[in-house]
A protein has these predicted regions:
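Clamp-loader machinery-focused feature within the broader ASCE/P-loop NTPase space
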Residues: 2-163
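Structural recognition of the conserved hydrophobic beta-strand(s) that form the central parallel beta-sheet
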Residues: 151-155, 168, 179-185
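Charged, glycine-rich active-site and insertion segments that engage polyanionic ligands
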Residues: 1-49, 55-58, 65-69, 177-180, ...
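Conserved strand-to-helix beginnings and helix N-cap segments that scaffold or border functional pockets
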Residues: 162-166, 288
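Conserved catalytic/switch belt of AAA+ P-loop NTPases
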Residues: 141, 166-180
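Conserved adenine-binding aromatic site and its adjacent loop/helix in ATP-hydrolyzing domains
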Residues: 138, 170, 197
């Protein structure tokens, strides 16, 4: 992965390259950022720059034997660790390595939900157990194939079981010479504090709307500039979310959410039952996408209600919705509506019954929007 292929983050790229050229390479670095920010492709680009045999001032050469191997994620000094569905027979990453390589080469902005779908483990927990930590130790005991750095990239280390995390900590405390750990995380709160203290933080921010809109138009040539910007604003810098909305018709999601809230406000129980049936048919990923989008809209409504319209980021039909729905917000219900949607999103992630959950949420919103 070349830095030039990573969307945005110009100043961060320059800092990473500058550190390398000045010989300031921390043995453990935590690429921390929200979903869809590009922390995985950034870490891969940094790994390629570390291992490149003919580094340029702004990027790896892309042509040397090392670069050609990394382009396929097959460099012998680049070790890849990631969460898997653990079974009695499969406890390490190796059996899934070709699948993960293919997934990342197809989409370097891969997220945990899409990885879970690829493994067909929708209702199962992806983890990294102690055997994977031992796998890390084994790989680091090998000599560098090309005599340079050995790079250990750990994707989503927050999904390590406690015993595995403790073993990783010991490796970080006593690193092998010439070893660089690249930890790629979306939730540092779940990492051991001692691991955080051993790693240099590389903070990766969400993509800027202009950067994201440009990337969307490059991927979807049929998108107008206005539509691309609308998706960029709605996804709040999350490329994965923006592309999911582009693939699944964000207008349909908006209409579903708007009309459902209208039914809740009017206390139209039969209509909300119909919406619950429709919600159940969406599938788990689109159900989660609906709640994420709904949370975005509610945040915009809250900003409008708080009389800071200059911070509101909506266009088109959403503007009318925000102006109207914000009039229903009060000190009593504004935070509660957001909390209910966040809770519902979490329950869907944990495989709650979609129809039961949606009806329960509908009744709760009825009470918040029009208390008796």
């Amino acid at each position: 992965m070349l830095f030039s292929k990573v969307i945005g983050h110009a100043s961060l790229k320059a800092r990473l390259i500058g550190n390398m050229r000045e010989g300031r390479v921390a043995h453990a670095q935590l690429f921390m950022g929200p979903r869809g920010c590009g922390n995985l492709p950034l870490a891969l680009a940094y790994a390629q720059y570390l291992l490149c045999e003919n580094k340029g001032e702004a990027d790896a050469c892309g042509e040397c034997p090392s670069c050609l191997q990394i382009a396929k994620l097959e460099h012998p000094d680049l070790h890849l660790i990631f969460p898997i569905f653990l079974t009695d027979k499969v406890k390490v990453c190796e059996p899934y390595l070709s699948v993960w390589r293919e997934a990342v080469l197809d989409d370097p902005y891969l997220d945990i939900d899409h990885w879970r779908d690829l493994l067909e483990s929708e209702n199962k927990q992806l983890r990294m157990g102690v055997d994977i930590a031992q796998e890390i130790q084994r790989k680091l005991s090998l000599k560098s194939f090309r005599g340079g750095y050995k790079v250990m990239l750990v994707w989503l280390p927050e999904l390590m079981d406690p015993p595995a995390a403790n073993k990783l900590l010991k490796v970080l405390e006593e690193p092998e010479p010439g070893t660089v750990f690249l930890l790629v995380s979306t939730d540092a709160d779940q990492l051991l504090a001692t691991i955080l203290s051993r790693a240099q933080l590389v903070k990766v921010l969400a993509l800027r709307p202009t950067e994201l809109a440009e990337a969307l138009q490059g991927h979807y040539p049929e998108l107008s500039q206005d539509d691309a910007m609308a998706l960029a604003l709605r996804s709040e810098g999350d490329l994965v979310e923006a592309m999911d909305m582009a693939d699944n018709s964000e207008e349909e999601i908006f209409i579903f959410f708007r009309d459902w809230l209208r039914a809740c406000y009017r206390r139209e129980v039969p209509t909300t039952v119909e919406f619950a049936d429709g919600f159940q048919k969406l599938g788990r990923e689109r159900q989660k996408a609906l709640f994420r989008y709904g949370l975005y809209l509610i945040r915009q409504c809250t900003l409008q209600w708080q009389q800071v319209p200059e911070l509101v980021r909506v266009i088109g039909q959403e503007q009318e919705f925000v102006q109207n729905f914000s009039k229903l917000l009060t000190d009593r219900n504004a935070d509660r509506i957001r909390e209910e949607l966040e809770t519902a999103h979490g329950h869907i992630e944990r495989n709650a019954n979609p129809k039961v959950l949606f009806m329960d949420l509908s009744y709760r919103l009825m009470g918040l929007l029009r208390p008796r």
